[in-house]
Amino acid sequence: MILSFNIEYRTNWGEEVRLAGLSTESVPMHTTDGIYWTAELELEVPQEGLTVHYNYQIEQNGIVTRKEWDNFPRCIFLSGVPRKKYRINDCWKNIPEQLYFYSSAFTEALLAHPERDSIPQGHKKGLVIKAYAPRINKNYCLGICGNQKALGNWNPENAVLMSDANFPEWQVELNASKLKYPLEYKFVLYNKQEKTVECWEKNPNRYLADPEIKTNETLVISDRYAYFDIPAWKGSGIAIPVFSLKSEKSFGVGDFGDLKRMIDWAVCTHQKVIQILPINDTTMTHAWTDSYPYNSISIYAFHPMYADLRQMGTLKDKEVAAGFSKKQKELNNLTAIDYEAVNQTKWEFFRLIFRQEGEKVLASKGFKAFFVANKEWLQPYAVFSYLRDAYRTPNFREWPKFSVYNAQEIEKMCQPETADYPHIALYYFIQYHLHLQLLAATKYARENGVVLKGDIPIGISSNSVEAWTEPHYFNLNGQAGAPPDDFSVNGQNWGFPTYNWDVMEKDGYRWWMKRFQKMAEYFDAYRIDHILGFFRIWEIPMHAVHGLLGQFVPSLPMSREEIESYGFTFREEYLRPFIHESFLGQLFGPYTHLVKQDFLQLTDKPGIYCMKPGFETQQEVKQFFAGKNDEDSIWIRNGLYSLISDVLFVPDTKEKGKYHPRIGVQRDFIFRSLAEEDKNAFNKLYDQYYYHRHNEFWFQQAMKKLPQLTQSTRMLVCGEDLGMIPACVASVMNDLRILSLEIQRMPKNPMHEFGHLDEYPYRSVCTISTHDMSTLRGWWEEDYQQTQRYYNTILGHYGVAPAVATPELCEEIVRNHLNSNSILCILSFQDWLSIDGKLRNPNVAEERINVPSNPRNYWRYRMHITLEQLMKAHAFNDKIRELIKYTGRNPEK
């Protein structure tokens, strides 16, 4: 079998085009002009035929400098006919403008073709025409109609239908011996149920001159794209944490079994996406503080509480089983999750069912295959969890043994004959069941045309399996967070270590690639939490509590000389807290004297104080006030925090003599104390530093990482691009076809108080509120003046806004969002429910999931009605279907 590859690519001096994927090494191509490249090779093909995959790449001096888009590798079927030649004419493939249609969200769920056609039969003289057309659902197919009998003579009734064997690429093989040239044709959209052509492509006729195909030769023409004048595809969905799901059989918390019931409701209401929060194990202390889903101890292991006990087996001891049944009813009747009681009870069940079924499960073929595929993370996770409980701390640095990870020692501990093994194997058993249950939910979702959308947290815990086993990937001497924004005026301190990107780059970001690829087993779309972290991260020193003393990493700090070039005189005292007699009363009121006496000391400058030794950092203050939770202590503690962060510049953590203007300092006393000309000069350098200086630098940082990571799987990529957004973010997301997040009360345009729904980009996800925000009803009651402006200017109503968001108002706002340009409109369960006066929760405050400014938030929100009740809410479900239908979010084609 002879394969002749041909491609046009204009190279620069020293570059060469090579074929990849056909063998272990790339195959060189040849050119005489640096534009037209060819390669011919011989391949052994079995009688039944062979499918080969390949792609093109550019190399220079043996180094790959560019690859074409290869999420869908080129695919060609070679018949087993002896002495056959395939002449393959290709064009370079760039990342498609409509990349989302090539994601598994569309190809495996939304526009899936579960019953594919067979590969077309070959001819002695063949012409294969291939075209990409991903925007075609299973009830339609691509056809070709043209200027001669073999192509239907322009009669759509005689159009030649193409095969979807390699969907979203379509292909047809024509008998070239029956063709007359020149060939003219168009692609058509064929309705398989009605057996009729519904649409012709609008562009001029496609044309092919005589390619002089010889006997025993097949010409393959690929890389065509077919577009039709049909409505833009738009869908809707629901956002709800798994822990918030509630069925009649839930065990006080949502589980993977409940996820199937939520899929049923999505199908019932014609919604296409279910978006959840992270589901990884966050068990640190077994206390309610472990409820924070973004502080995981493993990026792979699922939280045991998500196990559906019903699917794990039935306890043979009927009395014990009855006790669990009673406990299930008690926990399930609670309005909010009792995290500690739920997990304690589920763990009692895990131990009993493992004792009863564990040996059989661990000996099964299914488990053995799972263990081999996942051992790399599963074994360290199981040992970490075992040692965490044995030593009563997740901080592995404090463990008397194994504080430094040693793979060989851990392997010994995991041998079945050791005393430790039963404790470790219990975690294998639980994770296997979780894997099976989520995989079943994923399969169920895909079969029903629903996408499960996961969430990838930006950080990992400093007390986690990854920090223990792979510490070289992390900077453990800093804390990740976010600068001040609408969520938190003091910024956010997540407490996560930051990434050592230089080390990660050396192995091609293998750590991230594995993480994304594992997630793709269960999800067809994902949200990148804080995508800005791939451009730069807000790193906070370990001695700080709030986020105000942080700095962007990586960044370009300023020298003293550069600062002074703006007309601002730099002084060392600007690095120290500015504490003046004049404003202490404003901060501390009746406690001013106490604060001066216990925490401050006078300097040699009149009226100027400094912090006493032992209280010079926010962490020292936090430690002093630990356990003092009365209002007065909190008032004093927070006041001391603000004193300590009242500096004008923050020293760079890496380069001595370089500085960063302190974020948001214009609100603080040190800035107010400046002369007017100094304020103007400082604002000038501040604006340059935070809004212009880093644009190109951060663009390059993101483009080192994100192209490889986002294209390592076929999941649909959605970015959480909220907060302090550098100008370069939009261009990177556009180049990589990443969906943005649009929220009306957090507009991207700084000139607008509220986002304009008709200005949202198509490539975006729009929502009313996120888990970090108040719900629509909660927001309506937070700031009456803002609500009034929204009521008059955005909704266009006259008069006084209602004090509460009525069901009618909520429905109007929901409808407006469904009418937006965004490809996806994903609303929280609470906001969907707000449109029904009978169903919605009478207690608005109970619907809030997280308050970002509260580092000790208890994540315990639950649906106040069951999924069974939801399925029976026929009037409500009818209304949602109607809203979705009339806003064009349930396209038939």
Placement of each model-derived feature along the sequence:
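C2-type phospholipid-binding modules
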Residues: 76-91
